[in-house]
């Protein structure tokens, strides 16, 4: 009944107008699973490899026909006839077939598309929602959203060096209330920016991209918008940052071009600690560069007991890199991006390792997204308690929020909103 009879790959467009891979997996009973693969802008050096064609005459070299060919050829040949329920075996077969440590031969974008589509097809065969199929009967926790309302860095054409300024409505009573709160703050912020003479165009993830001179200026706007929307910063709504520090770490220094200054690793750690002291910041992602391990140890020592320190480029959803952080005591949280590692099995293993070590896990989108809402289901399936999926604009972002609304409604009285308990600062 759940044997794989067909795998169909195709080239589609992501939210930035770049090609990406979409995969359909068809089972013997007629069930179909479809998955589209996201793509990052600020990518970690240690991520699994996204295979691009490199043909400059087509999509400026960003085509993914080689990855699609791998899906329709080698991967189907290897997986045809296998039971879609055998997720671990299927993922392991693809990893071994690729034969490289970073999935560079067949492409993580090809392998991930198949991996997620297989799980969705199997869930469909059992007439189960994906979160229930993957997470079982214990999957009922709706995550606190990290809503990116001001964009900078690689996600916007403005002077701000930090990549994301986010709000977390952790004080809400339910996911739907948290979403409403975020929406109200988003629209209030738009009015405040417009009133101050800033443009209100949005960046890749739907947040505003004003020409502000510093992180402090952006944070002041965020705190003001929270208050003017009728909420209390630090009580109803918290702030999260993603500096994406690897992007401006040059020759051992954190170079703030817009502010005309450079900081060493110890100075960077102290600067972030100062921001946490002055603003209701409860989470910082990639506050230090991916290979600045001494910097990571410094910031963990300074504020690791009161602030969530999330490793994105640092850990790249990889259990080997995560284990090193756990063993050596740096960071206290991991960002989970399915395309950083390339299979569902490895993604779930990273969440499990984090939770066992007392680290938090944050399910995350990429800046190049599609209408695919798989990560919403995975956030609930893993009970990770937090999701990062952009702003309250652009359908590629709201598709995930809308799926979580559906899940919350479907769970009814069983639904549990993670709230403040999901955050290090309130434990």
Curated annotation (Swiss-Prot):
EC number: 4.2.1.11
Cellular component terms per the entry's GO annotation: cell surface; extracellular region; phosphopyruvate hydratase complex
Active-site residues, record numbering mapped to chain: 205, 337
Superkingdom, natural source: Bacteria
Entry cofactors: Mg(2+)
Top-level enzyme category: lyase
Pathway: Carbohydrate degradation; glycolysis; pyruvate from D-glyceraldehyde 3-phosphate: step 4/5
GO biological process, one term: glycolytic process
Record's subcellular location: Cytoplasm; Secreted; Cell surface
Amino-acid positions noted as binding Mg(2+) in the UniProt annotation, renumbered to this chain: 242, 285, 312
Binding site for (2R)-2-phosphoglycerate: 163, 337, 366-367, 388
Cofactor stoichiometry and binding remark: Binds a second Mg(2+) ion via substrate during catalysis.
Single GO MF descriptor: phosphopyruvate hydratase activity
Predominant location: cytoplasm
SUPFAM superfamilies, per the entry: Enolase C-terminal domain-like, Enolase N-terminal domain-like
Catalytic reaction list: (2R)-2-phosphoglycerate = phosphoenolpyruvate + H2O
UniProt cross-references to InterPro entries, sorted A to Z: Enolase, Enolase-like_C_sf, Enolase-like_N, Enolase_C, Enolase_CS, Enolase_N
Family named by the database record: Belongs to the enolase family.
Function in brief: Catalyzes the reversible conversion of 2-phosphoglycerate (2-PG) into phosphoenolpyruvate (PEP). It is essential for the degradation of carbohydrates via glycolysis.
Protein name in UniProt: Enolase
The species this protein was found in: Rhodopseudomonas palustris (strain HaA2)
